[in-house]
Amino acid sequence: MKFNTKINNLLIIALSTLMLSACSTAKKAGGGGAGDVYTGNDTVEYLASGVKDRVFFATNSSSLTTASRDTLRKQASYLRKNKKLNVVLEGHADERGTREYNLALGEKRANSAKDYLMTYGISGKRVSVISYGKEKPVNSASTPLAWSQNRRSVTIKAK
């Protein structure tokens, strides 16, 4: 009986330690203040070699930043060279706000990116838009850094 109690105590300690270690925080690569726009690379993937797949937005905004416009120019260049490739722009928001508000904001963000691609000669017929609002966060923490990573538009190759 004492042996089982010792094993149970050790198991509880081990599980508690494991759970606490899973709660470590991420480094603030891009600032991450409430109104900041995340520009770090830890959540960025690539549409093609050297062409980032996502752009980030300020809180409650669908306006493109200088960094976002630069990324979208590179995407447009890649798309001009790959004329058979179609893309989907996924609009996202952070967890704050209602589901409906965030779906609308995600759509505005994706459409801002689409409009910018179109100014660089990409046909709107090649670009689809979908909004996930706050439904698909890349970082589920409730922190300014997580929110800034989730305020994004992601460009993916259409299937």
Task: Describe these PLM feature segments.
Residues 93-98:
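Surface-exposed aromatic
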Residues 84-92, 107-138, 151-159:
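A non-catalytic structural micro-motif
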Residues 67-74, 100, 108, 112, ...:
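Extracytoplasmic/secreted proteins, especially bacterial periplasmic and envelope-associated proteins
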Residues 145-149:
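A generic structural micro-feature
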